[in-house]
């Protein structure tokens, strides 16, 4: 009841704030041709003239086919997405319009992201209720989420999509980060449901079961490697599914605005079935660029981590790198795309100036260099028109893939 009341108050506050559009703005934020009954995103159009062309022999849908089997995965540049599924629409009635205005960090579906070359995904399952289930034992399910907003796709449906792509493109692999996004306090059955889904017979052989720091591309082709932000065993002593867990501290500028490069470079990854199997993890996830100082910090820490990654990937040490481009200038789709439009050109310039690979780089607003769309807020006054933004995300993806040329066959 308290949670429902909170949602209602949040919706009222958001509608009041978002309803402050001037009359002159209505023509550009609302078009009768786009029905407000649509569930999530209105795609008004994309001008996809990509600034930096993909000029490799294999199609981008199968770009890993160019990489040697013996190449270590940790030595590659791997493009990915943050809050991968927010381009799939939200689940809760009425509230979905509020979340459309606050929680969208992607405007492309999972299928589009896979086809555009993304190989790292941010998957956030939470315990939810299947209102259509007739069997009480099947009422609780895992639905994907971004914070408190539940998405219109389940954990199982997401894995099914990943599996279908890998069957059609067996040269590829995926790395998927797991976390329970709205906290564990109400997620008592989270690991039980996680194990229930991951152990389904239809997924036999789909997941990497014997991760090592130096695992190779050949060993991962056709498979999904699960990374958890935390050790799941204290939550459920019986949970021993092959998931790699990470020592992944938060980087919230509201708590500590200063950068801490040493802490970013002293994280770790562990094989959950054998914690003596361990890798050093370089992790950068400074996720709020809500002031000029924080934007400068983000730009500095992303580029600095790219330079550290190049130094690490040429050594014999199997160091893993996850360097997030993603962040937000405000809690809205405009906030995610503004950060991307400010940061991605600097990352692109660095990739053009320096050779070498840079690890995993998750981004927002993937698959497009120019984004032009309407976000559905449920009324003409609360719809948001995003136009004139150039995140250059697909150009960034092309450069990341092309930086792997030293590992090509």
Spell out what each predicted region is:
Residues 151, 155-158, 195-212:
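Acidic, His- and aromatic-enriched active-site or binding-groove loops in soluble protein domains
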Residues 23-116, 129-168, 173, 234, ...:
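Long, acidic (Asp/Glu-rich), low-complexity accessory segments flanking structured domains
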């Amino acid at each position: 009841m308290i949670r429902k009341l909170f949602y209602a108050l949040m919706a009222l506050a958001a509608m009041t704030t978002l309803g402050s559009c001037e009359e002159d703005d209505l023509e550009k934020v609302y078009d009768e041709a786009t029905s407000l009954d649509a569930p999530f995103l209105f795609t008004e159009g994309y001008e996809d003239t990509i600034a930096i062309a993909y000029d490799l022999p294999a199609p981008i849908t199968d770009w890993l086919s160019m990489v040697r089997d013996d190449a270590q995965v940790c030595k590659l540049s791997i493009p990915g997405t943050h809050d991968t599924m927010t381009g799939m629409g939200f689940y809760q009635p009425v509230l979905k319009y509020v979340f459309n205005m606050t929680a969208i960090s992607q405007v492309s579906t999972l299928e589009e992201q896979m086809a555009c070359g993304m190989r790292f995904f941010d998957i956030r399952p939470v315990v939810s209720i299947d209102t259509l289930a007739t069997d009480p034992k099947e009422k609780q399910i895992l639905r994907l989420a971004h914070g408190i907003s539940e998405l219109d796709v389940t954990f199982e449906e997401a894995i099914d999509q990943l599996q279908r792509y890998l069957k059609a493109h067996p040269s590829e692999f995926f790395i998927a980060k797991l976390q329970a996004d709205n906290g564990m306090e109400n997620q008592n059955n989270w690991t039980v449901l996680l194990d229930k889904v991951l152990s389904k017979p239809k997924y036999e052989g789909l997941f990497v079961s014997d991760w090592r720091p130096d695992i190779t591309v050949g060993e991962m082709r056709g498979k999904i490697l699960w990374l958890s932000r935390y050790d799941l065993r204290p939550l459920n002593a019986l949970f021993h599914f092959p998931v790699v867990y990470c020592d992944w501290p938060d980087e919230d500028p509201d708590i500590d605005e200063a950068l801490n490069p040493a802490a970013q470079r002293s994280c770790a990854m562990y094989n959950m079935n054998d914690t003596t199997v361990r890798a050093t993890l370089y992790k950068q996830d400074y996720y709020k660029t809500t002031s000029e100082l924080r934007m400068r910090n983000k730009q500095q820490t992303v580029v600095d981590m790219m330079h550290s990654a190049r130094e690490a990937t040429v050594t014999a040490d199997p160091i893993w790198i996850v360097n997030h481009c993603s962040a937000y200038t405000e809690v809205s789709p405009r906030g995610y795309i503004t950060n991307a439009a400010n940061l991605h050109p600097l990352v692109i310039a660095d990739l053009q100036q320096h050779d070498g690979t840079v690890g995993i780089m998750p981004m927002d607003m993937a698959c497009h260099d120019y984004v032009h769309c309407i976000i559905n807020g449920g009324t003409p006054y609360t719809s948001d028109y995003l136009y004139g933004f150039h995140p250059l995300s697909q150009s960034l993806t092309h450069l990341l893939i092309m930086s792997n040329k030293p590992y090509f066959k």
